[in-house]
Amino acid sequence: MLTYNTPSHITAFSTTRDGGVSVQTPALYMPNHQVHGTRTVIIDEAFLSLSPLEQAIRTDGVDALSTNLTDVCVCVKTADCIPVLLWDDKTHIVSAVHAGWKGTLQRIVETNIEVLKSVYSTQPENLHAIIGPGISVDSFEVGEEVYEQFAKAGFSMDTLARKYPGMRDKSETRWHIDLWECNRQQLTSKGVNPANITIAGIDTYTHYDRFYSARRHCDGRIINGIMRTDNPFIA
């Protein structure tokens, strides 16, 4: 399991193919069904009082979870998609965001930050962020139609896209899009300090021996989680 360099009261991790979660997590929550959208569900005392079935219904079609509760681990599942884990020591929140290319295109990270501002009065300059393992620009080859969707959505394509020889047919060039940088730019555009952003820099497509990759037709998923705890984690 990959764990991140965080303060002792914050536990953040991404699982590998070697095994599951090996940190102490008194309560672990993840969306019942991720749909590459932008919805966030708040994990609060009211949510915890629901039955397991009601919780599953509430988190169906959700791609981000946020909480300010201690010892509650919010998670998202990925396999080439980009996980973004957030925390704020001022408002005591943690947040887990599933940013696939479609969610990135819809600016899910920006949407989640707006939810944090509305629900918890979070100030973006107090946020810390981890961009976890996901497909890199070298491996994320896309067609012209995907490139055009990002361009029409107002993204800075000069900084996010480049052409490489085709991965299957090197006689033609194909667009590649940098989803790590795209999500980093969304964070900074909302006011997150660049110094507070960590990029894991792990390409799941290249390192499919250690991390699950949907483009490699791997069936498994990486669990990416974050929680606030009164006690340092124990691996």
Question: What are these model-predicted stretches?
Answer:
Residues 1-235:
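Active-site microenvironment for binding and transforming phosphate-containing groups
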